[in-house]
């Protein structure tokens, strides 16, 4: 790729994109399919090894991307964890601290590093990967995870108000059941909590989905890519469910 092409192509950073079967990797692919130059961050398996809880690591990596391409147009905050017990009395301080550090502090670190570059070039788009658990509480989900995703939705809305005048659009996607490792863990927790088999737990969870099946990472990624695109030019501060109708009656 020539220098001129690098400088003219839109550039996106996607965090939490190291797992090949996750929403982050799918989002990176969807953005590349739209013509973006995409740089991925994760602890391993990504273009840059970055711990999003470390503000200096994040700032250094974002600066390197902006310096390499000359600008930054989009940020997808996908890095997240869901750890610990769904029983409040069994939740440890370590699990709470890690969940909030990655899911909330990590997101803020990335936004604080990326937004100054967007301000310099007159705008950009940020998509925060929240969760259906950021819109409503669900059974068999660690309380710290639910709290962190409500925080992501709140941050999305408040940051959208602050940076809208600067033409930086900030939205959240709220996936419901997605066919990832995190879903498998949630089904295991549900089975344990209800005292049922994994097969019955999966059937119970699937029964709450109006469309009858869990989403694929690529289906969530399609919404992420849309929100980064000019087709979403008038959308900011939104928290969009991608849940197969799980919130249909909510």
What are these regions (language model features)?
Residues 116, 161-162, 233:
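Alpha-helical segment proximal to the catalytic Tyr-Lys
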Residues 164, 169, 235-237:
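Short, small/polar-rich loop/turn modules that mediate ligand/substrate recognition or access, typified
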Residues 131:
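Residue(s) in the substrate-gating loop at a strand-loop-helix junction
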Residues 86-88, 95-98, 126, 205:
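Substrate-binding pocket helix/loop in short-chain dehydrogenase/reductase
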Residues 2, 82-85, 136, 213, ...:
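Short C-terminal tail/terminal secondary-structure segment
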Residues 3-38:
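Canonical Rossmann dinucleotide-binding motif of NAD(H)/NADP(H)-dependent dehydrogenases/reductases
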């Amino acid at each position: 790729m020539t220098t001129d092409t690098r400088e003219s192509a839109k550039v996106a950073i996607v965090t939490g994109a190291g797992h090949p079967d996750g929403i982050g990797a799918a989002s990176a692919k969807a953005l590349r399919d739209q013509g973006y130059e995409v740089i991925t961050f994760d602890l391993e398996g990504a273009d840059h090894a970055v711990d999003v809880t470390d503000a200096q690591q994040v700032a250094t990596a974002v600066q390197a991307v902006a310096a390499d391409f000359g600008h930054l147009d989009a940020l997808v905050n996908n890095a997240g964890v869901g750890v610990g017990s769904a029983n409040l009395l069994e939740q440890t301080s370590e699990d709470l601290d890690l969940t909030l550090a990655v899911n909330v502090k990590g997101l803020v670190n990335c936004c604080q590093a990326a937004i100054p570059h967007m301000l310099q070039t007159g705008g950009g788009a940020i998509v925060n990967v929240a969760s259906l658990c950021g819109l409503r509480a669900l059974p068999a989900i660690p309380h710290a995870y639910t709290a962190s995703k409500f925080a992501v939705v709140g941050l999305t809305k408040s940051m959208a108000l602050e940076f809208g005048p600067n033409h930086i659009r900030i939205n959240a996607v709220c996936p419901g059941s997605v066919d990832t490792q995190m879903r498998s863990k949630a089904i295991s927790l549900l089975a344990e909590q209800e005292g049922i088999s994994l097969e019955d737990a999966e059937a119970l969870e699937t029964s709450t989905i109006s469309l009858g099946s869990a989403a694929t990472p690529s289906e969530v990624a399609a919404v992420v890519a849309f929100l980064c695109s000019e087709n979403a030019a008038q959308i900011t501060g939104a928290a969009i469910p991608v849940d197969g109708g799980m919130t249909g009656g909510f």
